[in-house]
């Protein structure tokens, strides 16, 4: 049986759970990961922490789950042991308005042992994959201009971290 300890960083009532909440399975470093993520994203908080009781996959009294919000999105992290690992089959997408925002998230999420990957992807130091994407890509897609989209996508395929100015230049055929 698990015990619950509220560790909310804000006052007030706990929000109603989202219909769909992302659940992240960590080996034994969920607390470190959650503290890192909450430090990276604005409007983020740890809402609740549960600890293992007499039964479960972890030693009694150690952190089992952590409910947290990242910029308004609810997540739960689990210290579940080494059974499962993250893969690129699942990633979290961060939509960015400016190059400054892209640079910020890229640096934070790929740093300290993370890995830069092609096409705006990074794998953080915990093995979780993220896509750092400029909103400009969606704007071009919504325009419906196939030639412009093709030119932009060719540029996308050559980049690791997205460069909005470079994407715009490519999309315009310059």
Model-found features: residue ranges?
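Basic/polar N-terminal segments that are highly enriched at the extreme N-terminus
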Residues: 1-18, 168-174
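C-terminal cap/linker of serine protease catalytic domains
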Residues: 11, 144-174
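Residues that flank catalytic or metal-binding motifs in active/ligand-binding sites
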Residues: 18, 64, 88
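Short loop/turn microsegments at loop-to-beta-strand junctions
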Residues: 21, 63-64, 117-119
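Core segments of cupin and vicinal oxygen chelate
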Residues: 24-72
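Vicinal oxygen chelate
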Residues: 26, 30, 40, 70-74, ...
């Amino acid at each position: 049986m698990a015990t619950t300890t509220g560790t909310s960083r804000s006052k007030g009532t706990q929000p109603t759970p989202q219909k769909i909440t992302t659940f992240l399975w960590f080996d034994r470093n969920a607390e470190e990961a959650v503290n890192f993520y909450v430090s990276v994203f604005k409007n983020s908080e740890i809402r609740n922490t549960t600890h293992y009781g007499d039964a479960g996959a972890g030693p009694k009294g150690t952190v089992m789950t952590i409910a947290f919000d990242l910029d308004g999105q609810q997540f739960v992290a689990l210290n579940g042991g080494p059974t499962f690992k993250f893969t690129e089959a699942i990633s979290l997408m961060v939509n960015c308005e400016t190059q400054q925002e892209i640079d910020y998230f890229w640096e934070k999420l790929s740093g300290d042992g993370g890995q830069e990957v092609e096409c705006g992807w990074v794998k953080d130091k915990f093995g979780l994959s993220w896509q750092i994407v400029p909103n400009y890509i969606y704007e071009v897609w919504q325009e419906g201009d196939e030639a412009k989209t093709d030119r932009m996508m060719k540029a996308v395929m050559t980049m690791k971290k997205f460069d909005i100015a470079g994407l715009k230049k490519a999309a315009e055929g310059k």
